[in-house]
Amino acid sequence: MISVTELRNGTKVQMDGGLWECLDYSHLKMGRGGAKVVTKFRNMESGSIVDRTFNSTEKLQDIYVEGKKMQYLYPDGDDYVFMDMETFDQVHLGKNIVSDAAKFMKENTEVEVAMYGDKALSISLPNQVILKITQTDPGVRGDTVSGGTKPATLETGAVVQVPLFVEQGTDVKVDTRTGQYLSRA
């Protein structure tokens, strides 16, 4: 059991018959009454987000989530197929689990899958990935100093803003957390 005053961003708990991840929390001290903890949780199975307020004396059941290394193989309809790096078993994960990570995944990308027992909850990409630009407008001569940006479509279909000097066919390094261009690879 964990006290609600010990909650932090990313803490995973079991409540109301589901698995939840804490996205945000804040302590509120009341004038005469006890302190309250205002939280925002994301359901790890459905993705829904709820706001909850707890008394500072309440406790929640914390859970242990194991991270498994897997390799992305290919899309299969509405699912994505991954291979467990230890057992070489193939695992199908739905769009609700992969969510926004799909736009930065290319074949053979290694990811970490959060597992609770035998159930996959979410995936984590490496912080940076190298992807090829498949489509972007050509840079105009003299634009390399101006510091402007232009949209570029990556091989996975994601669109990122890149500097004007970056051309089609260039490999670029992208931050998967923010979706921003970092540098040429």
Curated annotation (Swiss-Prot):
<dbReference type="InterPro" id="IPR008991">
    <property type="entry name" value="Translation_prot_SH3-like_sf"/>
</dbReference>
<comment type="pathway">
    <text>Protein biosynthesis; polypeptide chain elongation.</text>
</comment>
<dbReference type="Pfam" id="PF01132">
    <property type="entry name" value="EFP"/>
</dbReference>
<keyword id="KW-0963">Cytoplasm</keyword>
<comment type="function">
    <text>Involved in peptide bond synthesis. Stimulates efficient translation and peptide-bond synthesis on native or reconstituted 70S ribosomes in vitro. Probably functions indirectly by altering the affinity of the ribosome for aminoacyl-tRNA, thus increasing their reactivity as acceptors for peptidyl transferase.</text>
</comment>
<protein>
    <recommendedName>
        <fullName>Elongation factor P</fullName>
    </recommendedName>
</protein>
<dbReference type="Pfam" id="PF08207">
    <property type="entry name" value="EFP_N"/>
</dbReference>
<dbReference type="InterPro" id="IPR012340">
    <property type="entry name" value="NA-bd_OB-fold"/>
</dbReference>
<dbReference type="Pfam" id="PF09285">
    <property type="entry name" value="Elong-fact-P_C"/>
</dbReference>
<dbReference type="InterPro" id="IPR013185">
    <property type="entry name" value="Transl_elong_KOW-like"/>
</dbReference>
<comment type="similarity">
    <text>Belongs to the elongation factor P family.</text>
</comment>
<dbReference type="GO" id="GO:0043043">
    <property type="term" value="P:peptide biosynthetic process"/>
</dbReference>
<dbReference type="GO" id="GO:0005737">
    <property type="term" value="C:cytoplasm"/>
</dbReference>
<dbReference type="InterPro" id="IPR013852">
    <property type="entry name" value="Transl_elong_P/YeiP_CS"/>
</dbReference>
<keyword id="KW-0648">Protein biosynthesis</keyword>
<dbReference type="InterPro" id="IPR014722">
    <property type="entry name" value="Rib_uL2_dom2"/>
</dbReference>
<keyword id="KW-0251">Elongation factor</keyword>
<dbReference type="InterPro" id="IPR020599">
    <property type="entry name" value="Transl_elong_fac_P/YeiP"/>
</dbReference>
<dbReference type="GO" id="GO:0003746">
    <property type="term" value="F:translation elongation factor activity"/>
</dbReference>
<dbReference type="InterPro" id="IPR001059">
    <property type="entry name" value="Transl_elong_P/YeiP_cen"/>
</dbReference>
<dbReference type="InterPro" id="IPR015365">
    <property type="entry name" value="Elong-fact-P_C"/>
</dbReference>
<dbReference type="InterPro" id="IPR011768">
    <property type="entry name" value="Transl_elongation_fac_P"/>
</dbReference>
